[in-house]
C-alpha cells in the first residue's frame, strides 16, 4: 500500500503529466493509495499563496483540491498521536521537522510505501519509498 507525496499528487493535476507516473498509478489499486492530511495542507498553502499572484489559477487549484479530497475521502490519513510521536522521534534523530518528515512518519505508522520524486527527503527516515518518475 502506498502514500502519495505532495509532488506526485501535484503531478496528477498537470495537463502534461509524466507518463511514468500515470502508468504507475494506473497499475495501483485505488484502495491501496492514500494521502496524508499534510499533503492537503501543503496544497492549501500553495492555493493561498497563489491568490495574490493569479486568482484564477488559485480558484482552479482549489476546485481540483476539493475534488481530490472527495475522491480520497476515506483514504486521507490524519496526523494523530502515534504519527506525531513517530515524527518527534524522527525529528530528534534526523534534525529536521518539515512536512516530508510528517509524511514519512505517517507512512511508517501505517506500513505504507511513500511514492515520491524527492527520494533524498526520505532516505534517512527508514521509510520504504519508490520514485514513479523513473
Predicted regions and their residues:
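Short secondary-structure capping/turn micro-motifs that flank functional sites
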Residues: 103, 122-124
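Active-site neighborhoods of divalent-metal-dependent phosphate/nucleic-acid chemistry enzymes
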Residues: 45-50, 59, 70-117
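A generic structural signal for short hydrophobic patches within well-formed alpha-helices
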Residues: 9, 40-43, 84, 122
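Nucleic acid-binding interface residues in structured DNA/RNA-binding domains
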Residues: 3, 113-116, 123
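Residues at the C-termini of beta-strands that transition into short coil/loop
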Residues: 37-38, 80, 118, 133
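Short, well-structured N-terminal submotif of metal-dependent ribonuclease cores
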Residues: 1-35, 39, 49-67, 134
Amino acid at each position: 500500500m502506498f502514500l502519495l507525496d505532495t509532488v506526485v499528487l501535484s503531478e496528477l493535476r498537470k495537463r502534461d503529466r509524466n507518463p511514468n507516473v500515470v502508468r504507475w498509478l494506473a497499475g495501483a489499486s485505488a484502495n491501496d493509495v492514500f494521502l496524508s492530511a499534510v499533503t492537503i495542507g501543503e496544497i492549501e498553502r500553495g492555493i493561498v499563496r497563489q491568490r495574490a499572484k493569479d486568482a484564477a489559477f488559485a480558484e482552479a487549484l482549489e476546485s481540483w483540491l476539493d475534488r481530490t479530497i472527495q475522491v480520497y475521502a476515506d483514504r486521507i490519513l490524519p496526523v494523530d498521536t502515534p504519527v506525531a510521536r513517530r515524527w518527534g522521534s524522527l525529528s530528534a534523530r534526523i534534525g529536521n521537522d518539515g512536512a516530508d518528515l510528517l509524511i514519512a512518519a505517517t507512512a511508517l505508522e501505517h506500513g505504507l510505501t511513500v511514492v515520491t520524486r524527492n527520494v533524498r527527503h526520505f532516505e534517512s527516515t527508514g521509510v520504504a519509498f519508490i520514485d514513479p518518475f523513473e
